[in-house]
């Protein structure tokens, strides 16, 4: 039977009703990135989402990059992986750039042969406690433990400086501050006069028995729940001063 109705639909000249799809051609969900007026004014439709966010000084995603970065042929640093202290790679030592540095050499006093090379990095791994040098403890093998505090502070300052230098970010921060102030000044909802009269009738008839108020079909025709009536009574009593 259903097949006959389908054949009638196919023969009919009436246009088919098509629902408006909220997805792109590749099947991904369409995201409204222009919800904010400041971002919409500074948005470049010729660039991708990541490129626009990078140009505006914003972060398109909070997670660390996992690959798929765009290779620019004009970039002189292309093909050379720089060490980033905050991207936890499998081996931090493998991505460090080799730079000329000074180090101490321990020689045999008799033959003059080099016995040991003391790198500056090894010196920073030791901490002096009560006159004795101890190796830095890292029982959990935290990769961030290898990153110095000065590197983390410089990275944080660099990220903060780049974000504040953008006019778009400053405008967004001002907008967020104004919205936060408006939210603080917003007054809570006040009970109307008819609502207060309704609560007075409920209390006059049932006292503190909220379950009886819920089951009263005359005074509670809208079937307000027990929790809803309890919240309304609490606000009503706080206003009257008899909590």
From Swiss-Prot:
Record InterPro entries: Ribosome_biogenesis_Nop16
Basic and acidic residues bias: start-end ranges: 71-82
Protein's name in the database: Nucleolar protein 16
A Pfam family matched in the record: Nop16
Cell compartments where the protein resides: Nucleus, Nucleolus
Record function comment: Involved in the biogenesis of the 60S ribosomal subunit.
Alphabetized UniProt keyword annotations: Nucleus, Ribonucleoprotein, Ribosome biogenesis, rRNA processing
Keyword Nucleus set for record: yes
Family: Belongs to the NOP16 family.
Region (Disordered): 1-22, 60-82
GO terms under biological process: ribosomal large subunit biogenesis; rRNA processing
GO cellular component, one term: nucleolus
Assembly, per entry: Component of the pre-66S ribosomal particle.
Key word Nucleus present: yes
